[in-house]
Every structure is written in structure tokens, then in C-alpha cells.
Amino acid sequence: MAAKDVKFGDSARKKMLVGVNVLADAVKATLGPKGRNVVLAKSFGAPTITKDGVSVAKEIELKDAFENMGAQLVKEVASKANDAAGDGTTTATVLAQAIVNEGLKAVAAGMNPMDLKRGIDKATAAVVAELKNLSKPCADSKAIAQVGTISANSDNSIGEIIAEAMEKVGKEGVITVEEGSGLENELSVVEGMQFDRGYLSPYFVNKPDTMVAELEGPLLLLVDKKISNIRELLPVLEAVAKAGRPLLIVAEDVEGEALATLVVNNMRGIVKVAAVKAPGFGDRRKAMLQDIAVLTGGQVISEEIGLSLETATLEHLGNAKRVILSKENTTIIDGAGADTEIEARVKQIRAQIEETSSDYDREKLQERLAKLAGGVAVIKVGAGTEVEMKEKKARVEDALHATRAAVEEGVVPGGGVALVRALAAIVDLKGDNEDQNVGIALLRRAVESPLRQITANAGDEPSVVADKVKQGSGNFGYNAATGEYGDMIEMGILDPAKVTRSALQAAASIGGLMITTEAMVADLPEDKPAAGMPDMGGMGGMGGMM
């Protein structure tokens, strides 16, 4: 085991503080409407220019192991805030820096670190409760667009396209962000249920110009096993041919003679048919087949419930208004399932989302919920260059998270004003002893730091602005974009309450941990002798090439 370097007390905390400040100073430059740009060097290609705090934080690694620990802990603040609300990472970093700097000064002056932390925790809980009281529901498209605009660094077009997407697919709908091919942002909405499986054979295509298979008013046969024997399918095919309607088969797979026979029947026009693999794998595939069954009013043909293909009748088949199959996707439009059953299924999936602890499972359940309850919207980000595209896409994703958070827990006045107003909750708050009171006072100063930083980035005087905002009340604040004072909500400067709350909680949590740090352990740097060049015999004239 490699030898370790151990530092204690003040010398450890000083090193950690250097790392905290290096990372936070780089990140906080991006805060607010007049946030500065940060240029990130890349090992290949052009450097990236960004105003996204997380992208800056991810790039920073320090040479000194102890300083690096401080930087990594602040990174943790940003990622905690990001995990909770999807945004507010820069605000969280600014708050954490203020808490750590003030806290370590107090510890150096002889205060008890544990009591300081208790004071900070007490004050944080009171401010969080006050933020809940201050929040207003975010119901209409205008408010959603404003939240998106603020989160996307004051880009109106991004706020508006997100509001439009939310309006079209509902609050439960899935909105994905992709790189577009044009200069402008585009929004496309998929009606009905879409899953990422395409037709099993190009011979099913009946619209050669667009290479899709379209079935009007089809019946849907849902099977949870492979179909390779055509004899199993014959009874259903005959019944469908008599009914004179097209058929879509969704099964684990259709192969061999079964697929060949379907293709021949389709080409001869005996039965209009198409086959597609069921989406997902394992248990998720079964669940998604059941979703399609509920949506179309059909039943999954499964031996687990005593149904086989030979005994399947038209009653077991689902119905839809239209089905479109492309090479990659299948879309079922206007399924004929009963509303009550769809609602029951939605309720069941919601309960599973509440219970699951896995982020991956939650995301997949959310997708299933959207396909049943809402729809799917795709925002295609347009830009002039690759560098701009990456930067813009990151901003759209941030804005999307922020608007979701706003719909969930409401909005508060932006620009750091909500935290200043929430100070009312801790003006008279007292701890159990003097050291706890110092912790409370320390948080009182720290919550002003986002407002001060936004002002500083805009080139104005932080103390003057902070003082004037504190003298005001309600939504009164400072619009750094225009340099005007006024009602923040009316000026359209809103923050999701969840983002502000998560930022403060993450900052207080990591800040408290750093203040109570007493020792740090890191690997000692190894002294390696400079390695000579290996012999490259037989390659005359190319010595020393790496």
C-alpha cells in the first residue's frame, strides 16, 4: 500500500479552502444574465465556450491532492443540486463557497465546529420552509416560458419552445432534446404511443416514397413469445382476412417461415399485415406489451394466463385508428382502450415511480407513463457551429429541468431575491448557545451571495444593490439584465422554488461537512525517475518519436 500524507486541523482546512475557492471562482463567473464566458481547452478540436456552471466544474482537477479534495467536494454540491432539481448548480456553488469561507474563519477564531454546523442546519431548515411559503404555482404557458428563458441564460426562443412542448404533451409527457441539422430550433410532437422498434421486413412497406408502412384502422395481435411456425398464426390470420382489416403483429420476434408467409400474403394483397418486435427486454418487455394492450383495448397472448395463438380470437386483438411503422420506430395513434383502464394503468405506474430507488428505472417508468398519459415531444436544437450546438444543447437541457421543477413546486422571484426575502424567517432565530448563533448569522450573510454575485457579474456594485433590495419587500428586486429595480415576477424573472431550495440544502450540507473536517488523508506523490526513451532499433531516422 502506498504511503499517505496526512494533514490536521487548520493546515488541512486551509488547503481545502484553496481548492474550494479555485473551483467556485471559475464557476461563479457564469452566474446571472450577464454571466461571463469560460473557455475550456479540449485535447482534440476547438476549445468549448460555455456559460454552464456544471460544464466548468467538471473540467477542474487540481495538482495538489488536498486542494483537489476541496474542489471535488464543491463539485459534489453542484451535482447534488443537479440531481435534485436539474439546475441551480452555480447558485449552489456560490452558496457553498460563502458558507465554507465564513465558517472556516469562525473555526479559526475558536468557535466549536459542531455547534456552528447545528446553527447552519437550523437556519437552513427555517429558510427552506419560508421559500415554500413564498412560492406561487406555475400554471400558465407564459410563466413556464419565463422560467425556461431565465435558466437558458435569457434566451427567449428556448423558453418559448419548451413552453410550447409542455403545452402539447402535458406535464407527464416526455420531452427529449436532440441535435438538429438547421440553424433554428425545431419542435416535433409524436401523437399516440411510439416505441423504438421498426418493421421486421422492408417488404411490409406500402409507402415507398417515405419508406414507411401505414395501416389504417388495424387490429393488433400482441404476443409475448417468438413466432416461427405459421400454423400457430393461421386461425388469427383467417379471422382477420374475413374481417377485411389490416393486422399489426407485435411479438418477441417473428422469424423463419412465419415471417416469409406474412410477407408473401402482404405482397399478394391477401391480408394487409406488418410485424414488429416488442419493445424492451425481459420484464420491461412484458410491462410494455401490457401497456400497448391497455392502450388499444386488446389482450397479450401469453401462456402465463392460459392463452395461446391457436385459441386467440378477434376479441383478444387490440384496435387503433392508425399505425405507422418506419425502419426504426412504430407509432400507434388513437388506441381504442377504455379510459378507465388507461387511468388505472397510469396510477399503477405512478405508484411504481414513487417506490423505485433506481434513477434508471424511474426514467424508464416516466417514459412509459408519458406514452400512456401524454405524448412525446422532440426539441431539435439548431446552431451555426458544432461548438455553439453543444453549448446551446446544454442550456436547453438545463432550461427543461428548471421548467419541470417549476411545474412541480412553483416559482419564486428570481435574481437571488427569494433567498433575501426568506431571511425574514431567521432574523429572530436563536440557537442554544453563542456558537450556534454564529452559525445562524453566517447563513444570514451567505444567502445574499447569489444576489451579490449576479450584480458583480453585471458590472454593478454588489453592496449598494443588496442594500436596496433588502430595504424593499415582496417581489422587489434588481434586474441585472437591464440594470432596473422593480417587481421581479412582472419583469419575468422567476426561479423554480425547487431549484432554489435544492441549491441551499446541498450547499449547507457540504458546507457543514467541510467546517467539521479535522483531518485529511491523501496519497504521497511518487518520485519517479525520468524515463529514458526506449530503444527503437530498426527505425532509422525516427529516434525519439512518441
UniProtKB/Swiss-Prot annotation:
* Classification via CDD domains: GroEL
Q: What is its EC number?
A: 5.6.1.7
Q: Which InterPro entries does the UniProt entry name for this protein?
A: Chaperonin_Cpn60_CS, Cpn60/GroEL, Cpn60/GroEL/TCP-1, GroEL-like_apical_dom_sf, GROEL-like_equatorial_sf, TCP-1-like_intermed_sf
GO BP annotations, alphabetical order: protein refolding
Q: Report any Pfam family annotated for this entry.
A: Cpn60_TCP1
UniProt GO cellular component terms: cytoplasm
Detail which positions bind ATP.
30-33, 51, 87-91, 415, 479-481, 495
For the protein in the UniProt heading, the enzyme class is isomerase
Question: Any idea which GO molecular function terms this record carries?
Answer: ATP binding; ATP-dependent protein folding chaperone; isomerase activity; unfolded protein binding
Keywords of this protein's UniProt record, alphabetized?
A: ATP-binding, Chaperone, Cytoplasm, Isomerase, Nucleotide-binding
Q: Which domain of life is it from?
A: Bacteria
Q: Coiled coil located at which positions? A: none
Compartment annotation: Cytoplasm
Task: Please list the reactions this protein catalyses.
Answer: ATP + H2O + a folded polypeptide = ADP + phosphate + an unfolded polypeptide
Query: Would you indicate the residue range of the signal peptide?
Result: none
Protein function: Together with its co-chaperonin GroES, plays an essential role in assisting protein folding. The GroEL-GroES system forms a nano-cage that allows encapsulation of the non-native substrate proteins and provides a physical environment optimized to promote and accelerate protein folding.
* Assembly information from the UniProt record: Forms a cylinder of 14 subunits composed of two heptameric rings stacked back-to-back. Interacts with the co-chaperonin GroES.
| Family the entry assigns | Belongs to the chaperonin (HSP60) family.
**HAMAP family membership:** CH60 (MF_00600)
Q: What is this protein called?
A: Chaperonin GroEL
Which lineage?
Bacteria, Pseudomonadati, Pseudomonadota, Gammaproteobacteria, Pseudomonadales
Q: Which gene encodes it?
A: groEL
